[in-house]
């Protein structure tokens, strides 16, 4: 029977290898307590690998290192998808707003754009005034503060006129600016009203010549001669033009192109030929007929010295004995390249000629015939 000392030494020697192996295994091969709770299924694989391979390292810690990356990828993928959907929604919203903005064009916007187009003629004088303020042309009359305020106002007005897409929000301000501009530049406002009315009336019935530079120039005769001077010869702006329905007697019209003379051999009315040409001069023509064939006469090609003109009335023509009624037109300036056919002398236009009863001959295509000498 063994002694107690031998039993204790045997037990210590038999237990020491187990403790040493357990300590080595706990340091290198086994996971921690937290890893045991989460991944209990992988605990047996290191032992089996260690038993079979011996020196092969255990892949336990490596798997633990890759797992957070997989989880992060799983979290980032939905996040990227959410961001992509938000960007797509924002783009769709921008497209919808742009379509709504383009489609919402009200009558006020169109009226604002039309007003800006009508007031384009004031941009040039406003620019000249602004340049004069910058160059010091008004230093004596205005202080520096007044000049700076004036320049700021003029720049704002010009900026509004150059942006017709601003919309009806500023329509009231534009109407106030229009009244102010017409007060500052009355000659430009009058010129726009006269030429605009005549062009609007002509554009309804005659083709427009955009390529002709002369057609764009304002008519000088309408600016100088008013309705009081022309009298009954002036055609009202609202009166419709019916070329085919005009009679041959007492024909009155205002035309903005040179007169096209019909051939003298034609026995019809002179209204069959439309006064459409390439020039832009304006004349007033009165056609009369007394039982016979109508006479035609066009305006002279050279300007006539300014003399007081009196309107030609059919009643005054009867006072002249021995004179046949003719077609008479007021003198205007025609283009240099316009060839016109001139006929025998026309009726007198001044009071002096009417009292004498002998009209002075004007430029004609036939040589003037000298009167027979009285015995």
Curated annotation (Swiss-Prot):
Compositionally biased spans, kind Basic and acidic residues: 33-46
Gene knockout outcome: Mice exhibit a longer circadian period of locomotor activity, alteration in the expression of core clock genes and impairment of the response of the circadian clock to stress. The peaks of DBP, NR1D1 and PER1 gene expression persists longer in the liver between Zeitgeber times (ZT) 12-14 hours.
Superkingdom: Eukaryota
Reported induction: Expression in the liver oscillates in a circadian manner with highest levels at Zeitgeber time (ZT) 12 hours (at protein level). Expression in the heart, lung, stomach and kidney oscillate in a circadian manner with highest levels at approximately circadian time (CT) 12 hours. Its expression levels peak at circadian time 12 hours (CT12), 8 hours earlier than the peak of PER1/2 and CRY1/2 transcriptional repressors (peak CT20-CT24). Thus, it can repress the CLOCK-BMAL1 activity in a different time window compared to CRY and PER proteins.
InterPro entries in the cross-refs: Ciart
One of the Pfam families matching this protein, by short name: Ciart
Main subcellular location: nucleus
Any one Gene Ontology molecular-function term assigned to this protein's record: RNA polymerase II cis-regulatory region sequence-specific DNA binding
Keyword Transcription: yes
Keywords per UniProt: Biological rhythms, Nucleus, Repressor, Transcription, Transcription regulation
Biased amino acid composition, Low complexity: 1-32
Region span, Disordered: 1-102, 192-218, 351-375
Record has ATP-binding as a keyword: no
A single Gene Ontology CC term: nucleus
Location of the protein in the cell: Nucleus; Nucleus, PML body
Subunit structure: Interacts with BMAL1, PER2, CRY2, BHLHE41, HDAC1 NR3C1.
Function of the molecule: Transcriptional repressor which forms a negative regulatory component of the circadian clock and acts independently of the circadian transcriptional repressors: CRY1, CRY2 and BHLHE41. In a histone deacetylase-dependent manner represses the transcriptional activator activity of the CLOCK-BMAL1 heterodimer. Abrogates the interaction of BMAL1 with the transcriptional coactivator CREBBP and can repress the histone acetyl-transferase activity of the CLOCK-BMAL1 heterodimer, reducing histone acetylation of its target genes.
PANTHER family reported in the protein's UniProt record: CIRCADIAN-ASSOCIATED TRANSCRIPTIONAL REPRESSOR
Record protein name field: Circadian-associated transcriptional repressor
Gene: Ciart
């Amino acid at each position: 029977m063994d002694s107690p000392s031998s039993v204790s030494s045997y037990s210590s020697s038999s237990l020491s290898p187990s403790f040493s192996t357990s300590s080595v295994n706990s340091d290198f091969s086994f996971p921690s307590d937290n890893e045991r709770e989460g991944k209990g299924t992988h605990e047996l694989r290191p032992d089996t690998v260690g038993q079979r391979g011996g020196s092969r390292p255990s892949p336990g810690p490596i798997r633990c290192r890759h797992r957070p990356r997989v989880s992060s990828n799983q979290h980032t993928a939905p996040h990227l998808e959410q961001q992509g959907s938000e960007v797509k929604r924002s783009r769709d919203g921008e497209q919808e707003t742009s379509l709504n903005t383009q489609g919402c064009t009200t009558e006020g916007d169109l009226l604002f754009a039309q007003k800006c187009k009508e007031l384009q003629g004031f941009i040039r004088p406003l620019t000249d005034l602004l340049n004069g303020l910058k160059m010091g042309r008004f230093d004596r009359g205005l202080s520096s503060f007044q000049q700076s305020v004036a320049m700021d106002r003029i720049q704002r007005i010009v900026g509004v006129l150059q942006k017709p897409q601003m919309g009806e929000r500023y329509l009231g301000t534009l109407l106030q600016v229009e009244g102010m501009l017409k007060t500052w530049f009355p000659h430009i406002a009058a010129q726009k009203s006269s030429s605009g009315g005549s062009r609007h009336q002509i554009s309804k019935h005659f083709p427009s010549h955009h390529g002709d530079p002369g057609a764009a120039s304002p008519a000088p005769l309408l600016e100088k001669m008013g309705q009081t001077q022309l009298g009954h010869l002036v055609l009202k702006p609202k009166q419709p033009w019916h070329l085919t329905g005009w009679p041959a007697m007492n024909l009155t019209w205002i035309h903005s192109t040179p007169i096209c003379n019909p051939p003298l051999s034609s026995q019809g009315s002179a209204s069959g030929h439309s006064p459409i040409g390439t020039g832009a001069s304006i004349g007033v023509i009165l056609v009369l007929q007394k039982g016979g064939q109508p006479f035609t006469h066009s305006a002279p090609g050279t300007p006539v010295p300014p003399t007081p003109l009196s309107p030609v009335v059919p009643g005054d023509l009867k006072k002249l004995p021995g004179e046949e009624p003719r077609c008479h037109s007021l003198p205007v300036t025609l283009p240099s390249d316009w060839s016109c056919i001139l006929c025998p002398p026309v009726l007198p236009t001044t009071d002096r000629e009417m009292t004498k009863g002998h009209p002075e001959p004007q430029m004609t295509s036939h040589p003037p015939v000298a009167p027979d000498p009285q015995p």
